C-alpha cells in the first residue's frame, strides 16, 4: 500500500494553490534575505500579540504542519496569569477544547509575512489558531 501523507494545512482546508504560491514566495524571500529567525505570532483575547520564534530553516514545516503550543497561552490576563483553572472538572463545559491544558496548533498565514527592519535577520508571520 502507498499512503499519501496529509499535512495539517490540508486537513484544515488551507492548502489552496494560491496559499502554496504564497508559501513558496515567502520561503524564497526568506532565503534570499538571509533570515535566521521568524517570529510566529497570534493575537490573544485582549488584542495583544504573543509569539514564538522559530529558526527560518524550519519555516516550511510550520507552513505545512503548523506549530503546537499549550492552550493556556490563549487564556492569559493582561498580567500574564492564566485566568481559567484548566484542570478542574467544570472547565470542559465553560471552555471546550481547553480542558487539561490541551494543545492548540498555529498555522502561519503567508500573506502576512514581513521582514522586521528593527530586528536583524528576522521575519514575522501572523498565525491562525486551530483546535
Q: Locations of the language-model features?
A:
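ATP/Mg2+-dependent ligation/transfer catalytic cores
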Residues: 1-131
Amino acid at each position: 500500500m502507498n499512503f499519501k501523507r496529509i499535512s495539517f494545512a490540508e486537513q484544515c482546508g488551507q492548502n489552496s494553490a494560491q496559499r502554496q504560491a504564497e508559501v513558496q514566495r515567502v520561503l524564497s524571500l526568506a532565503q534570499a534575505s538571509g533570515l535566521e529567525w521568524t517570529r510566529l505570532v497570534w493575537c490573544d483575547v485582549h488584542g495583544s500579540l504573543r509569539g514564538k520564534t522559530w529558526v527560518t530553516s524550519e519555516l516550511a514545516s510550520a507552513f505545512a504542519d503548523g506549530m503546537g503550543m499549550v492552550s493556556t497561552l490563549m487564556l492569559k490576563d493582561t498580567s500574564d496569569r492564566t485566568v481559567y483553572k484548566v484542570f478542574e472538572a467544570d472547565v470542559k463545559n465553560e471552555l471546550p477544547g481547553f480542558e487539561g491544558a490541551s494543545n492548540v496548533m498555529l498555522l502561519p498565514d503567508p500573506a502576512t509575512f514581513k521582514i522586521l527592519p528593527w530586528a536583524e535577520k528576522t521575519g514575522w508571520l501572523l498565525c491562525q489558531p486551530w483546535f
